[in-house]
C-alpha cells in the first residue's frame, strides 16, 4: 500500500493523459488531479482538460475490455479531478508530475511558480525526455526534492520509468519516487543526471539512422520498419543491448564497426574505447567467460537455450495474434 495519496499531473497532453491513466489503473486509493497551467482565452480554460478527460475515459474503457482494469471505468474516473490554474490542483499533493512541453524556460518558470505553495516534502518529478536536472535546479529553492521521471508512451502500458537524480537530490526523494513507481506496477531504473538519460539517447541515434537510410534510398519506409519489427526490435524484447553485444560476441561489433567506419567515414560507427580494450583483453562474451557481464559459473549452452525459448514464445505470440504484425507501415486494420 503506497503512502502517497494526492498526486498532481501538470499538463493535459499525451504524456499527462498516459500517466493519469496509469495511476487510475492502480488499485491503490490514489486521488489524482490533472492541472492545466497554460493561460487560455476566457471561456476556453477547461477545453484541453475536457479533451484529456475523454481520452482518459477511452483508455480505461479499452483496458477494461481487455481485462486489465480491476474496477469499472466510471469508478476509476471518480478518483481524478480537473483544474485550471495553479491554485487548487497543487494543494496538499505529495508528488507533482510535470508534463509540460520540452522547453527549458517553460519548465523553469513552472518550478519557480509552484515551489512556494508546496509542502517541503512534496516531490517535483519532471517527465522530460531530454532536459537534465541541472536546468531545474538552477531556479529551485529546494533542489533536493526534484527528480526526473521519464515515462515512455503509452505511459499506461510501457513498464519503464527512468528516474534521474543529481548530486543535489536527497536520498529520501529518490527512494520515495522509486518505491511509489514500484507500488503502482512500474519498472523504475536510476540514471545519473545527463541530457537524454538512456532510452532517448538510444532512440534518437536509431531513429536518425533509420531516416538516413530512407533519405539515401536504401529501402522504403515500410521495409525499414519491417526490418526493425521482425529483426532488430524483435530481439530486443528478449535481450538488452549490452547483453546482445556479449552474446553476439564483442569481436563481431568491433569488426563491424571498423568496416562501417571505413565505408562511411562517420564517427558514430567507430568502435567505443571499452570495446577496443576488451578486444585486447580477450573479453569477448560468454565463450571467453567475460564480456561486459561476468559469465563465471554460467552454463552458456543453457543460457542460449533459455533465450531461444523466449524468442520462440514471442514468435508464436505474434503469429497467433489478431493485432500483432511484423509488417511495417500502415496496415488494413488501422483504417
What residue ranges belong to the model's regions?
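Rossmann-like NAD(P)-binding element
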Residues: 37-50, 62-123, 131
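Rossmann-fold dinucleotide-binding core
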Residues: 123-193, 200-201
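Mid-domain beta-loop-alpha active-site segment that forms a flexible
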Residues: 198-202, 206, 248-252
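Hydrophobic packing residues within well-ordered alpha-helices of enzyme cores
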Residues: 23, 114, 136-137
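NAD(P)-dependent Rossmann-like dehydrogenase/reductase catalytic/cofactor-binding core
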Residues: 2-5, 10, 26-28, 175, ...
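NAD(P)+-binding Rossmann beta1-loop-alpha1 motif at the extreme N-terminus of oxidoreductases
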Residues: 1-62, 66, 117
Amino acid at each position: 500500500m503506497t503512502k502517497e495519496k494526492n498526486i498532481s499531473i501538470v499538463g493535459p497532453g499525451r504524456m499527462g493523459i498516459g500517466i493519469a491513466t496509469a495511476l487510475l489503473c492502480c488499485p491503490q486509493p490514489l486521488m489524482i488531479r490533472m492541472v492545466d497551467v497554460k493561460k487560455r482565452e476566457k471561456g476556453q480554460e477547461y477545453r484541453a482538460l475536457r479533451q484529456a478527460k475523454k481520452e482518459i475515459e477511452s483508455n480505461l474503457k479499452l483496458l477494461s475490455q481487455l481485462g486489465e482494469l480491476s474496477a469499472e471505468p466510471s469508478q476509476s474516473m471518480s478518483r481524478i479531478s480537473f483544474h485550471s490554474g495553479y491554485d487548487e490542483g497543487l494543494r496538499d499533493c505529495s508528488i507533482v508530475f510535470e508534463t509540460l512541453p520540452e522547453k527549458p524556460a517553460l519548465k523553469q518558470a513552472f518550478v519557480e511558480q509552484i515551489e512556494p505553495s508546496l509542502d517541503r516534502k512534496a516531490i517535483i518529478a519532471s517527465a522530460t525526455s531530454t532536459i537534465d536536472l541541472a536546468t531545474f535546479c538552477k531556479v529551485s529553492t529546494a533542489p533536493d526534492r526534484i527528480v526526473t521521471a521519464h515515462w515512455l508512451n503509452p505511459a499506461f502500458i510501457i513498464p519503464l520509468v527512468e528516474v534521474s537524480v543529481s548530486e543535489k537530490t536527497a536520498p529520501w526523494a529518490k527512494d520515495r519516487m522509486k518505491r511509489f513507481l514500484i507500488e503502482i506496477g512500474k519498472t523504475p531504473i536510476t540514471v545519473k543526471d545527463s541530457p537524454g538519460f538512456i532510452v532517448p539517447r538510444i532512440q534518437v541515434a536509431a531513429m536518425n539512422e533509420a531516416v538516413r537510410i530512407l533519405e539515401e534510398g536504401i529501402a522504403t519506409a515500410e521495409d525499414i520498419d519491417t526490418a526493425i519489427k521482425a529483426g532488430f526490435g524483435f530481439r530486443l524484447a528478449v535481450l538488452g543491448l549490452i547483453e546482445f553485444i556479449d552474446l553476439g560476441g564483442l569481436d563481431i561489433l568491433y569488426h563491424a564497426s571498423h568496416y562501417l567506419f571505413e565505408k562511411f567515414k562517420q564517427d558514430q560507427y567507430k568502435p567505443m574505447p571499452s570495446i577496443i580494450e576488451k578486444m585486447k583483453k580477450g573479453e569477448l562474451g560468454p565463450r571467453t567467460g567475460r564480456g561486459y557481464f561476468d559469465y563465471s559459473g554460467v552454463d552458456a549452452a543453457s543460457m542460449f537455450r533459455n533465450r531461444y525459448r523466449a524468442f520462440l514464445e514471442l514468435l508464436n505470440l505474434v503469429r497467433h495474434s489478431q493485432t500483432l504484425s511484423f509488417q511495417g507501415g500502415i496496415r488494413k486494420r488501422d483504417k
